[in-house]
């Protein structure tokens, strides 16, 4: 049995990672190698900040390539069945209103590999998602956040 971590994600999220990996392997890797060549041409490497910066960037790019390959290899695709659901599950967009003020927020709950709060995609490991997963429309939920406790009511699940 494999002990490697799995990465739940949508097909769209996996495609984004594959695109980033391709870009790193075909474009960024070559750019960094070229920067290293240029920096080497400046002579003494012991005091060559351009060379050090290029080597640091190379280490970052290679590390990210390894990370992406691992995430893609261990991806578990969240299938959107298209079925209407009343229960909050991974891959669904949940709308809730804060109590008592009624302000509404909506988030799509995804795996950590494709989470981007600025795009409304939160990780299933986040405090908000952990509190909402498995709950139903109409349920009132208390969410523990770093900023304190928040009461919400689930309005819709898509």
Swiss-Prot record:
Q: Name one GO molecular function term.
A: DNA binding
* Record family assignment: Belongs to the GreA/GreB family.
Gene3D superfamilies the UniProt entry points to: Transcription elongation factor, GreA/GreB, C-terminal domain (3.10.50.30), Transcription elongation factor, GreA/GreB, N-terminal domain (1.10.287.180)
- Enumerate the PROSITE patterns for this protein: GREAB_1, GREAB_2
Supply the alphabetized keyword list: Coiled coil, DNA-binding, Transcription, Transcription regulation
Q: Gene name, please?
A: greA
Entry-linked NCBIfam families? greA, PRK00226.1-2, PRK00226.1-4
Keyword set includes Transmembrane? no
Residues annotated as coiled-coil are: 3-75
**Domain of life here?**
Bacteria
Q: What does this protein do?
A: Necessary for efficient RNA polymerase transcription elongation past template-encoded arresting sites. The arresting sites in DNA have the property of trapping a certain fraction of elongating RNA polymerases that pass through, resulting in locked ternary complexes. Cleavage of the nascent transcript by cleavage factors such as GreA or GreB allows the resumption of elongation from the new 3'terminus. GreA releases sequences of 2 to 3 nucleotides.
- From the Swiss-Prot or TrEMBL record, give the protein name: Transcription elongation factor GreA
What biological-process GO terms show up in the record? Answer: DNA-templated transcription elongation; regulation of DNA-templated transcription elongation
């Amino acid at each position: 049995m494999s002990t490697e971590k799995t990465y739940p994600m949508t097909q769209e999220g996996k495609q984004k990672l594959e695109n980033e990996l391709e870009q790193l392997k075909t474009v960024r890797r070559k750019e960094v190698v070229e920067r290293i060549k240029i920096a080497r041409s400046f002579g003494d490497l012991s005091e060559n900040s351009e060379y050090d910066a290029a080597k640091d960037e190379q280490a970052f790019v290679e590390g990210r390539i390894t990370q992406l390959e691992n995430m893609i290899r261990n991806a578990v695709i969240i299938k959107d069945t298209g079925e209407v659901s009343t229960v909050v599950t991974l891959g669904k967009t949940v709308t809730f209103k804060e109590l008592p003020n009624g302000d509404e927020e909506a988030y799509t709950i995804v795996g950590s590999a494709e989470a981007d709060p600025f795009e409304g995609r939160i990780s299933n490991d986040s405090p908000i998602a952990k509190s909402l997963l498995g709950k139903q429309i109409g349920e009132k939920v208390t969410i523990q956040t770093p900023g304190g406790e928040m009461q919400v009511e689930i309005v819709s699940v898509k």
